[in-house]
Amino acid sequence: MAYVAVLAAVALWPQPVDRPVAGLLRAALRWLHGRGIPGWVDYGFVESAANVLLFVPLGALVAVVIGRGYWWVGAAAGLLISCAIELAQLLFLPGRYPTIADVLANTLGAVLGALLTLLVRRRRRAAP
């Protein structure tokens, strides 16, 4: 239940949730780049990675609840919920910026979570 509350807060906050820490994140990235982190690890990369990670638990939770053989429902749930969030941002949150890239990253996260559930189940079955 706490996960759902966090997901809703992050997705439906009136302004981008990273806005208060954007300057700090940019400074941290500059510092990391000065120490050898590749240039492609930029603000956009961090934002996309956060979108992926945010939906991993969703895919896993749905796959666990639905049961064996239907792991893909976790992935589908991620796609549908992400589309609903982006539509809500478009229609009701003028301070937010809905994008297809967010839908793709969120869906990837849900797929990874669902596949992780599948992998754990298979390992448990194979264990003596």
Question: Which ranges hold each PLM region?
Answer:
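Non-cytosolic membrane-interface motifs at loop->transmembrane helix junctions
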Residues: 95-105
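Bulky hydrophobic segments
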Residues: 1-96, 114-128
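Alpha-helical transmembrane segments of polytopic membrane proteins
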Residues: 47-50, 103-108
